[in-house]
Structures are given as C-alpha cells and as structure tokens.
Swiss-Prot record:
Gene Ontology biological process terms in this record: dTDP biosynthetic process; dTTP biosynthetic process; dUDP biosynthetic process
Entry EC no(s): 2.7.4.9
Cellular component annotations (GO), alphabetically ordered: cytoplasm
Enzyme class: transferase
Organism (species): Thermococcus sibiricus (strain DSM 12597 / MM 739)
HAMAP family on file: Thymidylate_kinase
UniProt binding sites for ATP: 9-16
PROSITE patterns on file: THYMIDYLATE_KINASE
UniProt entry keywords in alphabetical sequence: ATP-binding, Kinase, Nucleotide biosynthesis, Nucleotide-binding, Transferase
Family to which this protein belongs: Belongs to the thymidylate kinase family.
Stored InterPro entries: P-loop_NTPase, Thymidylate_kin-like_dom, Thymidylate_kin_CS, Thymidylate_kinase
Superkingdom to which the source organism belongs: Archaea
Protein name stated in the entry: Probable thymidylate kinase
Record flagged with keyword Cell cycle: no
Length: 210
C-alpha cells in the first residue's frame, strides 16, 4: 500500500510550495509520487473555480445563485471523483499521494460559512482519511499580507473575518483528527520543508519500524 499525505492551512500558508518540495523529496528517495489538489481539474472542480461567494451565505456560478449546502455538495462531488479515480487507485498501486487540500478544507471552510460540522463530516464519510495531514498554521495578519495582491479591496473585511474563522476551525479539527500535525508556517520556506520531512520520518517511518 502507498502513503497518503495532505497539506492544509488557510490561504497564503504555502501549501502548494511545500507540496511540490515534498513531492521532490520523496522522488529523490525512489518513490513514485502523485501530486494532486482540490478542487481538482475535473468538470466539478472547474465548476467550483467559477464559484463566486457573496456575503458568506450563498454563491454565484455563471449568474446562478446556489446555497452553501449546494456548494458543499459540489465540493463533495468533486472529491468523490478525486477519490475513486485517482487517490484510491494510486494508494493501492503503492504510490505516495500528496494532496494540496482535501476534505479537511471543506470542514474548516464550510463550517466557517455556517454549516453544521457533523453534517459535513457525514457528507464526506466516503473519503478515506489521510495517513498524515500537515496543517501549515499561519496568523491571519500574515495570511492577508500574502494574499492581498490576489484580492479585491472591497472584499477585504470579509476575507479577514473568514480567514479568522477558518484558522480557528483548523485548530479545532487538529484536536478531533489524530492524523493532523501542526507546523509553524511563519518560518522560512526551507525550514518549513525540513520540519515537514522530519515529521514524516518520525510519524510514518520510525513508528512503522517499532
């Protein structure tokens, strides 16, 4: 069987950068790596990328309003395709799967948007839990500094409030899911990478030998 690792964190935490560095680290050690992300590049994922959120209550896709419940179902549909067509087959083939976001993101973000956590957990019950989830924890102020160039100024206050809720939710999820480990995302990029690989060595390799 393979290894399934997920990188999570609020916007601007450096997930994509660290996922690529981690994939290279495994490849240098002879592993076959599948680097993936959510939302995916499937039809569902492309639809999600056209989603524009308004006021934390509903969203718009191509001019059509959808509820936050429909939004959660759309993310779950994308994830179902991801799991069945890529994640599970790759793990069964003995590969290392590294995902930039997974269902933990849905829990943190959609919980922050007012949906019930248990409802979200049940909705995503089909998705296998990761062997290790690396939560790149970043203060909201630094997150805003990093993503400010990507954002519309008129949405600034909404973004700050959402990121505060999401960070709080991620830290709560770390208490609920024992596969989640917290890494300080304020450190330099190379230091974060070294912290992640040391964690993997300990959690996935050394413990397996005991």
């Amino acid at each position: 069987m393979g290894i399934f690792i997920v990188l999570e964190g609020i916007d601007g935490a450096g997930k994509s950068t660290q996922a690529k560095m981690l994939a290279k680290w495994f490849e240098n050690r002879g592993y076959e790596v599948v680097l993936t992300k959510e939302p995916t590049d499937t039809a569902f994922g492309k639809l999600i990328r056209r989603l524009v959120l308004i006021g934390g209550k509903e969203g718009i896709i191509d001019g059509a309003r959808i509820s936050k419940e429909a939004e959660a179902l759309l993310f779950a549909a994308d994830r179902a395709e991801h799991v069945k067509k890529l994640i599970e087959p790759s793990i069964k083939a003995g590969k290392v799967v590294i995902s930039d976001r997974y269902f933990y993101s849905s829990l943190a973000y959609q919980w922050a948007r007012g949906l019930d956590l248990n409802w979200l957990i049940n909705l995503n019950a089909f998705a296998p839990r990761a062997d290790l989830v690396i939560l790149l924890d970043l203060p909201v102020k630094e997150s805003i500094n990093r993503i400010n160039g990507r954002s519309i100024r008129s949405e600034f206050d909404k973004i700050v409030e959402l990121q505060k809720k999401v960070r709080k939710n991620y830290l709560k999820l770390a208490e609920k899911f024992n596969e989640i480990r917290i890494i300080n995302a304020l450190a330099p990029v190379e230091d974060i990478h070294n912290d992640i690989t040391a964690l993997i060595e300990h959690e996935l390799f050394e413990k397996a030998e005991d």
